[in-house]
């Protein structure tokens, strides 16, 4: 074990024990306002050379509308099982948060867009780690 690990053992234990847990396995209680505030604060402590955060965190209040969105991006020939699975991403978990990016494009050839995308990804990791440190499980999903 390295000397650095020994000094920061609790940090490494927390990071190394974090794993994604799907919506069907998440249970109540969901994080309260204080827990969310702490996780979002951690999520905003990410490298961004432009000193502006190219994202925002939003608590989803209408899970049915989110389920509609997840279903709407499926191919036209998606079967009922695929539709139910897509909708379940929004409906099964005790709560849903959205990481909304500005000026992000994974297909861009623009260096600034790449940096904004990496900053948003770092924010997501800090958010998940912040929830895990408080005893909450979570998983990132996309539409």
Segments predicted by a language model, with ranges:
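Generic beta-strand structural signal
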Residues: 93-95, 134
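Small-aliphatic-rich amphipathic alpha-helix that forms the alpha element of a beta-alpha
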Residues: 43, 104-143
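A short acidic, glycine/proline-enriched capping/turn motif at secondary-structure boundaries
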Residues: 64-66, 102-106
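Active-site-flanking beta-strand signature of metal-NTP-handling nucleotidyl enzymes
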Residues: 96-102
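N-terminal amphipathic, basic helical "cap/leader" segment at the start of enzyme domains
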Residues: 1-93
């Amino acid at each position: 074990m390295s000397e650095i690990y020994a000094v920061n053992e609790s940090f490494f234990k927390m990071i190394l024990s974090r794993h994604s847990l799907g919506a069907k396995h998440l249970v109540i209680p969901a994080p309260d306002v204080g827990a969310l505030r702490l996780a979002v604060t951690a999520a905003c402590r990410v490298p961004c050379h432009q000193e502006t955060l190219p994202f925002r965190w939003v608590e989803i209040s209408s899970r049915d509308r989110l389920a509609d969105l997840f279903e709407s991006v499926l191919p036209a020939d998606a079967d009922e099982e695929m539709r139910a699975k897509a909708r379940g991403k929004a409906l099964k978990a005790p709560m849903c948060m959205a990481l909304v990016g500005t000026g992000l494009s994974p297909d861009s050839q623009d260096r600034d867009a790449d940096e904004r995308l990496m900053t948003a990804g770092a924010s997501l990791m800090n958010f998940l780690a912040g929830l895990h440190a408080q005893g909450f499980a979570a998983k990132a999903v996309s539409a």
